[in-house]
């Protein structure tokens, strides 16, 4: 499983689960995030994961839902760099499964 595309349409994706990971780990795994809507999300990743063995791909979104100052008020939120619980979205449950697999592979390799 590898990150194939960092510029994907996420229209129609929805929450599939949550992961625990620090910001730096996600940056190493998925690249730099893009700004979120600055209301309920501060940053987000939207990527396509590709499985070389099967040829299948999965769109995955990762975002900090309602954790920042933009939602909770100035001084009450958590900076993206300090977030450790992230929402995972996609078109189906494969998004959560494949992202978790990729995270476990990265952690085992470290």
Give names to the regions the model predicted.
Residues 1, 107-110:
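Short intrinsically disordered terminal tails
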Residues 1-21:
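N-terminal trafficking/processing presequences and adjacent post-cleavage segments
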Residues 15-36:
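Amphipathic alpha-helical segments
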Residues 17-24, 55-56, 95-99:
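Short, conserved charged micro-motifs
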Residues 19, 49, 88-90:
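Short beta-strand-to-loop capping motifs
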Residues 32-67:
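Amphipathic, interaction-prone secondary-structure segments
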Residues 60-97:
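Intrinsically disordered, low-complexity regulatory segments enriched in Ser/Thr/Pro
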Residues 64, 101-102, 109:
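Extracellular, modular beta-sheet/disulfide-rich ectodomains of secreted and cell-surface proteins
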């Amino acid at each position: 499983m590898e990150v194939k595309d960092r510029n994907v349409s996420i229209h129609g994706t929805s929450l599939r689960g949550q992961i625990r990971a620090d910001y730096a780990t996600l940056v190493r795994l998925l690249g730099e995030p893009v700004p979120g809507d600055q209301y309920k999300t501060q940053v987000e990743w939207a990527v396509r994961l590709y499985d070389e063995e099967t040829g299948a791909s999965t769109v995955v979104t990762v975002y900090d839902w309602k954790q920042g100052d933009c939602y909770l008020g100035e001084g009450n939120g958590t900076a993206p760099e300090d977030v450790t619980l992230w929402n995972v979205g996609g078109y189906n449950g494969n998004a959560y499964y494949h992202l978790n697999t990729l995270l476990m592979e990265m952690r085992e390799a470290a």
